[in-house]
A protein has these predicted regions:
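Active-site helix-to-loop segments that bind/position phosphate- or nucleotide-bearing substrates
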Residues: 19-139
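Flexible, glycine/charged-enriched surface loops at secondary-structure junctions
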Residues: 61, 77-86, 160-176
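Short terminal or interdomain "cap/linker" segment that borders an active site or interface and mediates
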Residues: 120, 169-190
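Compact, glycine/acidic-enriched structural inserts
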Residues: 137-156, 160
Length: 190
C-alpha cells in the first residue's frame, strides 16, 4: 500500500506511532482475515501447493497438515486486516483541474490514500517459537512457510478488494525492516 510517512510531522514520534494515532483518529475499518482464505488453509490443495512451493518432500505432507491444523484456531481468533482512507495533505500530490474559462479558481483534486495493515496474530509467532524451543525446527519452518503463503494470498485478496470496492489501486506495499523509512523497530507500534 502507498504509505507516505513523509506527510507527517515526526519530530518526536516515530512514523509508526504517527500512523497508529492517525488510523485511530480516523474511521478505521478492521476486518477478520479473509474468511475464504482461512477456509482453504487446511485443504489438500492449499497444503500440497505449500509443500511443492517450499520444496518439502511428499512424506512431509502429514506434518504440514498437523501444523496447519494447530495454526487454524489461532488464525481464526487473531488474524485481521485494517484499513484507513485519508486525503493527501502533501501539496506535491495535489492536482488542479485546470483554469476555468471565466477565470475562476481551479478546483483542487486531492488524491486519496489508504493505509492498511495485515497480521496473522501474535499466536502464530508463539507457536513458531514453541516449536523452535522444543527443537522441532521442521515444524517451526512449516509455520513460517504456511504463514508466508497465507499472507501472500492475503495481499492478493486485499488487492482484489481494493479494485472491487474503491476507485483506487494498490501502488505498492511497504514492510517494516525493508527500507530506511520503515525500520523494523516500528513493528511494536503498529
Amino acid at each position: 500500500m502507498d504509505v507516505a510517512y513523509g506527510e507527517f510531522s515526526c519530530e518526536r514520534e516515530t512514523a509508526g506511532a504517527v500512523l497508529e494515532k492517525r488510523m485511530i483518529q480516523e474511521n478505521v475499518q478492521t476486518e477478520r482475515f479473509f474468511p475464504a482464505l482461512l477456509e482453504e488453509f487446511v485443504t489438500p490443495v492449499f497444503l500440497e501447493g505449500v509443500r511443492r512451493k517450499f520444496h518439502f518432500d511428499g512424506g512431509q505432507l502429514a506434518e504440514i497438515r498437523e501444523v496447519a491444523e494447530e495454526m487454524l484456531p489461532v488464525l481464526q481468533k487473531e488474524a485481521f486486516w485494517a484499513r484507513a482512507v485519508y486525503p493527501s495533505e502533501n501539496l506535491s500530490h495535489v492536482e488542479t483541474s485546470g483554469i476555468n474559462e471565466d477565470g475562476a479558481q481551479p478546483a483542487m483534486l486531492y488524491a486519496a490514500y489508504e493505509k492498511a495493515a495485515m497480521s496473522l496474530g501474535h499466536g502464530v509467532d508463539l507457536l513458531q517459537e514453541s516449536y523452535s524451543e522444543k527443537g522441532r525446527l521442521l515444524q517451526s519452518y512449516i509455520v513460517e512457510a504456511l504463514a508466508g503463503e497465507l499472507l501472500m494470498r492475503g495481499y492478493d485478496a486485499y488487492n482484489r478488494y481494493v479494485a472491487a470496492y474503491t476507485d483506487r489501486h494498490v501502488a505498492r506495499y511497504h514492510f517494516p525492516g525493508s527500507e530506511e523509512a520503515f525500520p523494523l523497530g516500528m513493528l511494536p507500534e503498529l
